[in-house]
Amino acid sequence: METQELRGALALLLLCFFTSASQDLQVIDLLTVGESRQMVAVAEKIRTALLTAGDIYLLSTFRLPPKQGGVLFGLYSRQDNTRWLEASVVGKINKVLVRYQREDGKVHAVNLQQAGLADGRTHTVLLRLRGPSRPSPALHLYVDCKLGDQHAGLPALAPIPPAEVDGLEIRTGQKAYLRMQGFVESMKIILGGSMARVGALSECPFQGDESIHSAVTNALHSILGEQTKALVTQLTLFNQILVELRDDIRDQVKEMSLIRNTIMECQVCGFHEQRSHCSPNPCFRGVDCMEVYEYPGYRCGPCPPGLQGNGTHCSDINECAHADPCFPGSSCINTMPGFHCEACPRGYKGTQVSGVGIDYARASKQVCNDIDECNDGNNGGCDPNSICTNTVGSFKCGPCRLGFLGNQSQGCLPARTCHSPAHSPCHIHAHCLFERNGAVSCQCNVGWAGNGNVCGTDTDIDGYPDQALPCMDNNKHCKQDNCLLTPNSGQEDADNDGVGDQCDDDADGDGIKNVEDNCRLFPNKDQQNSDTDSFGDACDNCPNVPNNDQKDTDGNGEGDACDNDVDGDGIPNGLDNCPKVPNPLQTDRDEDGVGDACDSCPEMSNPTQTDADSDLVGDVCDTNEDSDGDGHQDTKDNCPQLPNSSQLDSDNDGLGDECDGDDDNDGIPDYVPPGPDNCRLVPNPNQKDSDGNGVGDVCEDDFDNDAVVDPLDVCPESAEVTLTDFRAYQTVVLDPEGDAQIDPNWVVLNQGMEIVQTMNSDPGLAVGYTAFNGVDFEGTFHVNTVTDDDYAGFLFSYQDSGRFYVVMWKQTEQTYWQATPFRAVAQPGLQLKAVTSVSGPGEHLRNALWHTGHTPDQVRLLWTDPRNVGWRDKTSYRWQLLHRPQVGYIRVKLYEGPQLVADSGVIIDTSMRGGRLGVFCFSQENIIWSNLQYRCNDTVPEDFEPFRRQLLQGRV
């Protein structure tokens, strides 16, 4: 008995201690912070704690669907949206991202890994900010009471000025701009206190962190040591109370016995107990009844799970309406009580969920996963010799595989004519091309030119043969090349002397050599030049105003430097809010003086139009938050969860084709019943198909209805892209600082299919404005000089000035002449690099591009030609690139004449999920990129199949 009394007193004493000790921490329920005055008070507490508290904790319980995420908690400035402190969950890559304002005014980001939170299950997360007021704070992440990740020695947090408090705003997962895409059950912020006390609040033993167990043990020993004397006194007093209590209980037992005897005597005399109000049970079936003195003499307990009411009357709760527990597309059936979900919709697999109550419905939502129909052993039901492409919740049957002809309706049959030398319609140095409608055409191989039926040697690989060919169709590519050794895919010949301008030392035939002629393409023997630029009056579009760039935006023959209306929209430059972009309506929604047509932030004022990362989104509205990695930030992406860099939206409904189930909005679904739509991009609700070939009449020969027939259309499934054209391009300078700054000078020829760079320049890019998903990109590369030995190449998947892939080639080994910030050594040989620069343009990226190898936070070398051979002067090379960003497939081939000299093989990398194309130079002049060709292509090549299996097995 004395041992039990001692244990009780000890427990009582410990409870008193912890109750008093918990008073030096503050617990704030963030989900209840609503009205402005209350938010200001809470913000002031947080600001003070950041300056004075030892630790600050964010404790939350929530549930996220797979691969989803969002902002968990954020403290922002309403005035300029300054991010003082923010914690968000990036479910797609299993991490928690913490960002805060540093003392130097920059935002610092901390990635906490091993945060598997987006799996449809409920998790408790504790984020500990240790020593926020110290010079080097630390962050600890606990997931379900286990230590997941930690970072110490972080940059100090910037103190929040007191004047900012009234303008602070607290956003949680339920109220943030990027909302948590799940359910937040609780969210508290704890100011001060130790991990032991916070662990008691969250009922966590904190596995994996022995320091916390030690803290609890030490605290207990400290309590016993300090309170020993008081404990003895309290136990003595407690024993006296127990003795008195025992005597009182004995007296009560005697009195109860007397009362019981009296009642028994009354029953003998004829007195009977009153009838129970709970018999029969007046409550709802299954609800407990309890006798009470108040009217009506009973009280009913709570309604059973799944029902609601006062206990007497209970009605069913519709879990389907209140919790939405079923997967989209799966019907929710409400029962009495409870609910159940029907089977996952077609194209998905998962469990059939059933249960009772809203809490259960919210915590046990149905999860359905996509089925890869194409790997069912039956090619998804498509023709065995056709291409099957898996999509989310469905699949689509594509064209016949290479070497087969036909379609899904008629079947894909072997194309014997293209694989039998005795019957092939193509030249021996040509290959077959298979069009969408099943037709076959021929194309000469690399190093050969002609119409495909007849091919001849093409030394400079510009698409024109060295000798004229006897073609029956009078194809222009059968005419003799007017520059045999220098690529000129446009065959320009200003003086019509049969020698192309690219290799004619007097291109205009005026008797003055090109190197001395101030009008190379216009005869002007007098060489008159009224202004101070390098162009004579005969060819100067501003003869009296110096303008070496000769830019003419509206193409009216009058250069921008002297044109009063540069864009030709009828509004003078001085009054035009977009002087270089036609916009006769002058719409300016944000009233910043820059019209919407040329405003990089049309809904946010940014009169300076600064765009530090050259992604065409102004710095003011550039969030750099891109969940799917396709180069478009989530706020502007028409499919924010699916990579679609092209942003194609055929029906202009604001939903990209990649995530739109009815691309043309004609009421016929693209792939699922009552579809598939036989003209997916062109409205045809009647689905008329006169020849029964599976392709509707309205898109028979022009699938995207862009007035360019499919065999000539470089993107047959996009009405926005028809021909290869780099006439409109963006210049990106990768080293914008320096005393000897020389920017590239780009000259575009052949209607945008040829680019020449004339200057020995700093690193720079010429980037087209068309963004691609999957793409085939090829061109001829030629250095038309013998005076230099530096870099040239091309780029793809350009997203901004710090994120793109580049294929680059150096002629000889060389150490870069500026050793700051690090020594960079270039090796000869073709290189494929993934640029993911943290700093962006500047000396770090400049040296990283020059260097052959990996450079932290700048460039990763994905592949280099093992031959380690540089390019040769005045020699033409042809590259072929295949990029399928949806699976990370990259392959680069390089030809010298008809000979394949380099092949990267299959490279798997998903750093950039699509983007724009362009060309690259670094300290190399007189580069020609000729006969440029790109083509949209999302079909995954067959050599990816081994990697697909490895990806599914987690080995790549």
From Swiss-Prot:
User: Which residues form the TSP type-3 repeats?
Assistant: 457-491, 492-527, 528-550, 551-586, 587-609, 610-647, 648-687, 688-723
Instruction: From the UniProt entry, list the residue stretches annotated as the region Disordered.
Output: 518-537, 546-702
Q: Which cysteines are joined by disulfide bonds?
A: 278-289, 283-300, 303-314, 320-332, 326-341, 344-368, 374-388, 382-397, 400-412, 418-432, 426-442, 444-455, 471-478, 483-503, 519-539, 542-562, 578-598, 601-621, 639-659, 679-699, 715-936
Listed under GO biological process in this entry are:
bone trabecula formation; cell-matrix adhesion; growth plate cartilage development; ossification involved in bone maturation
Q: Which Pfam families match?
A: COMP, EGF_CA, TSP_3, TSP_C
Domain EGF-like as annotated: residue spans: 316-354, 370-410, 414-456
**Its function?**
Adhesive glycoprotein that mediates cell-to-cell and cell-to-matrix interactions. Can bind to fibrinogen, fibronectin, laminin and type V collagen.
Q: How does it assemble?
A: Oligomer; disulfide-linked.
Name of the protein in its database record: Thrombospondin-3
The species is: Homo sapiens
Quick one: which gene encodes this? Answer: THBS3
